Amino acid sequence: CTFVGLVRDMGGPGATGEEIRGMTLEHYPGMTEKALQTIDTEAQARWPLEATLIIHRYGRLEPGDQVVLVAAASGHREAAFEACHFLIDWLKTKAPFWKLEDSSSGGQWVDARDSDDAAAARWMHAGNKSSEAAE
């Protein structure tokens, strides 16, 4: 299973509807890599996976650019699909990235979205040994 996220040309839910000219993604080296490794390790513990991959770009990006790739390989398709969902859901809420969107009205730092928090929260009660042990 793979997922490639692209830079959108319009802001997400709650945005002004302005066209996005680009965005700058910032991260904290060391801290971000550690968070991504922790997310990867958690996925490996939850599902029977052969391999996982997380690649996240940073710096200046334009609409349509690829910004993130998550991948999971497993002998069981459901495990791979669930792991991909988990990887992107947790990455969006637990990895320290900061997004500055550039629109016609200037730059605006993007706040975390409630929908991203809700997507990540479902994995806290996923009914598998790893999530139950974390509770």
Model features per residue range: what roles?
Residues 1-67, 73-75, 81-85, 89-135:
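N-terminal, polar/charged subdomain of small-to-medium soluble alpha/beta proteins
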